[in-house]
Amino acid sequence: MNSTQPLGMHTSLHSWNRSAHGMPTNVSESLAKGYSDGGCYEQLFVSPEVFVTLGVISLLENILVIVAIAKNKNLHSPMYFFICSLAVADMLVSVSNGSETIVITLLNSTDTDAQSFTVDIDNVIDSVICSSLLASICSLLSIAVDRYFTIFYALQYHNIMTVKRVAITISAIWAACTVSGVLFIIYSDSSAVIICLITVFFTMLALMASLYVHMFLMARLHIKRIAVLPGSGTIRQGANMKGAITLTILIGVFVVCWAPFFLHLIFYISCPQNPYCVCFMSHFNLYLILIMCNSIIDPLIYALRSQELRKTFKEIICCSPLGGLCDLSSRY
């Protein structure tokens, strides 16, 4: 997925980046000189150290999320199980991008005999990235469905969303996404595969949007119905809406961070020879950075929106070698 490979090197997701190669001579020359009308130059270079650093940060943050959910029994609920699945997907996307940078660096510095082996490894990493992307989308959709049930089927929720069903759902998501991700990379040279991936992305977003339109339009009506019941129904419903708002933020960040990459794919198949499309595609590495930033931002959203998760984060950090930071923060 990372495009720091030499010109003319086409492997799996790398072949989806035509901004620096595979273009007609006149367009290539325009890029080489700098496309003055659009302010474009050759493929934007991002230091490999940036990819590796972001990968490490994402790894640490998302491991913290996974450990926190596993450690705190108060977080053993369907929503947090799906968040855990999303954290795994985010971690794999970001770490795989960082690892791929190392692989491509080795590819550029090794002999021709070793390149075929390195390309195979690169294809495996790309399969992980593609599978994790699909798992991220499916996990977000699962959280949306879970929030929908908590609001519209509050009284039957615990009978509908059992731990067993959640486990089966998560397992099915990862099995299907793994198979799909591998197939996408195997047939990545086909435009039909790219169209299919784009279609999956926008279809999932449309499904989530439709759930949210219905959810927020009807939320007040259901809050009024729950309010007449004995107990703390209103409080419970308010917590459910808070979870829905959290997911709205997650989806918004996901769209902002992933949309440029999918727009790149749309340009790749629709106008690969247009100078303006080439201009947009010349920033491919920047779009990869945005994708990795999504994996870093998500854990921060969890922490800001969940007091229980924030509390567990602090407990874990205080028990780690960084525990001295807790003493320092308590003094101020």
Curated annotation (Swiss-Prot):
Which cysteines form disulfides? C40-C279, C271-C277
Q: Where is the signal peptide?
A: none
Keyword Nucleotide-binding (UniProt)? no
Keyword match Lipoprotein: yes
Q: Give residue ranges on the Extracellular side.
A: 1-43, 107-123, 187-191, 272-280
Membrane-crossing residue ranges in chain numbering: 44-69, 82-106, 124-145, 166-186, 192-215, 249-271, 281-304
User: Which molecular-function annotations from GO does this UniProt entry contain?
Assistant: melanocyte-stimulating hormone receptor activity; neuropeptide binding; ubiquitin protein ligase binding
Glycan attachment residues as annotated in the record? N2, N17, N26
Q: Which UniProt keywords apply?
A: Calcium, Cell membrane, Disulfide bond, G-protein coupled receptor, Glycoprotein, Lipoprotein, Membrane, Metal-binding, Palmitate, Receptor, Transducer, Transmembrane, Transmembrane helix
Residues given in the record as Ca(2+) binding sites: E100, D122, D126
GO:BP terms for this protein?
Answer: adenylate cyclase-activating G protein-coupled receptor signaling pathway; feeding behavior; insulin secretion; positive regulation of bone resorption; regulation of eating behavior; regulation of metabolic process; response to food; response to insulin
Topological domains, Cytoplasmic:
70-81, 146-165, 216-248, 305-332
Q: Please, which domain of life does this record's source organism belong to?
A: Eukaryota
Question: Topology versus the membrane, per the UniProt entry?
Answer: Multi-pass membrane protein
Compartment(s) of residence: Cell membrane
Residues with covalent lipid (S-palmitoyl cysteine) sit at C318
Q: How does it assemble?
A: Homodimer; disulfide-linked, also forms higher order oligomers. Interacts with GNAS. Interacts with ATRNL1. Interacts with MGRN1; this interaction competes with GNAS-binding and thus inhibits agonist-induced cAMP production. Interacts with MRAP and MRAP2; these associated factors increase ligand-sensitivity and generation of cAMP.
Function of the protein:
Hormone receptor that acts as a key component of the leptin-melanocortin pathway at the intersection of homeostatic maintenance of energetic state. Plays a role in regulating food intake: activation by a stimulating hormone such as anorexigenic alpha-melanocyte stimulating hormone (alpha-MSH) inhibits appetite, whereas binding to a natural antagonist like Agouti-related protein/AGRP promotes appetite. G-protein-coupled receptor that activates conventional Galphas signaling leading to induction of anorexogenic signaling in the hypothalamus to result in negative energy balance.
Protein family membership: Belongs to the G-protein coupled receptor 1 family.
Report what the protein is called: Melanocortin receptor 4
